[in-house]
Regions:
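Membrane-water interface segments at the C-terminal ends of transmembrane alpha-helices
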Residues: 8-43, 52-160, 188-208, 232, ...
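Short coil/turn motifs that cap or connect alpha-helices
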Residues: 89, 176-177
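Short hydrophobic faces within alpha-helices
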Residues: 100, 166-173, 241
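Membrane-helix/interface signature in polytopic inner-membrane proteins
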Residues: 156-167, 177
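Glycine/proline-centered hinge or cleavage motifs at structural transition points of membrane proteins
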Residues: 173-174, 187
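Glycine-rich helix-loop "coupling/hinge" segments at transmembrane-helix boundaries
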Residues: 210-236
Length: 275
């Protein structure tokens, strides 16, 4: 028995050593990439963040990301609720379609939007003042298409993990589905919803593939921070590109920290199903 226990401990120690070694390798790989951006971006950082084109790109990125995230959350909340709390028709097919969108290349999503808004319907919208192709409005549309499935998944997971017994009790006492949603489900998932909003905003800030396909990158018109990096690399201005990348890295780090702090449950930890 003692010999069997010793062999089991050796196997466990070997497995632990392999997993720790793999984790350290992954951390080193990711840390090297982050360090390369920081080291290369520091020399020109102060000058770059004061340049007119980077300031324009920063303002446009923050504005479009904020607008698109508000729209995404407004659409994702009822969609996630319908997928988790109702018997909507084709619910399984709808969920699979949303998951499929997550696996598609962003440039393909941008191409689909370009086809839609270059169609007669898109031209009609343009004639009536809603121009999307090669305009800042197109950036918002690209962000919405890319991030909406992601937000739906986050919110859907939060809704599925919430304790439904409280909603059942409220409904037996005469509460409407809207009342249960507003007074029970949203407060229970407040931390997860806050994290979903912040992470969706961060993804919108860094989105580039769909935006490039739909609106292109033009200085002082459709130039976001990722677009600014792209233009700097295209013109051989690598120091400015790395400094801009460092700025995006700092913003991403701050948003991640904010999501960790604000995304905590008001009860100290997230409620688990059945507890």
């Amino acid at each position: 028995m003692k010999s069997w226990n010793r062999n089991r401990c050796r196997q466990y120690d070997l497995f632990s050593a392999i997993t720790i070694g793999t984790a350290l390798l992954v951390i080193f790989f990711i840390g090297s990439a982050i360090s390369a951006v920081i080291i290369s971006g520091i020399p020109c950082f102060a000058e770059t963040i004061r340049s007119e084109d980077v300031l324009f790109a920063f303002r446009l990125s923050v504005t479009t990301a904020s607008i698109s995230t508000v729209i995404v959350m407004a659409l994702a909340l009822p969609t996630a609720y319908a997928l988790t709390r109702t018997d909507m028709p084709f619910k399984r097919l709808s969920g699979l379609m949303i998951e499929l969108t997550l696996s598609l290349p962003y440039i393909l999503l941008g191409l689909s939007l370009l086809i839609i808004f270059s169609s007669p319907a898109g031209k009609w919208l343009k004639e009536h003042g809603f121009k999307v192709v090669f305009s800042p409005a197109g950036i918002v549309m690209a962000h919405i298409l890319v991030n909406l499935p992601y937000a739906v998944r986050l919110i859907r997971t939060a809704f599925e993990a919430s304790d439904r017994r409280l909603e059942f009790i409220a409904q037996t006492l005469g509460a409407s589905p809207w009342k249960c949603f507003l007074t029970i489900l949203l407060p229970l998932c407040r931390g997860s919803l806050t994290s979903a909003f912040i992470l969706t905003w961060s993804r919108a800030l860094g989105e580039f593939g769909a935006t490039l396909m739909l609106v292109g990158v033009t200085r002082f018109k459709t130039e976001t921070l990722p677009g600014s990096i792209y233009l700097s690399i295209s013109t051989g201005n690598n120091p400015t590109a790395m400094a801009t990348a460092m700025l995006m890295l700092m913003i991403s780090g701050c948003t991640l920290a904010l999501a960790q702090v604000l995304g905590k449950s008001p009860y100290g930890r997230e409620r688990q199903v059945g507890h």
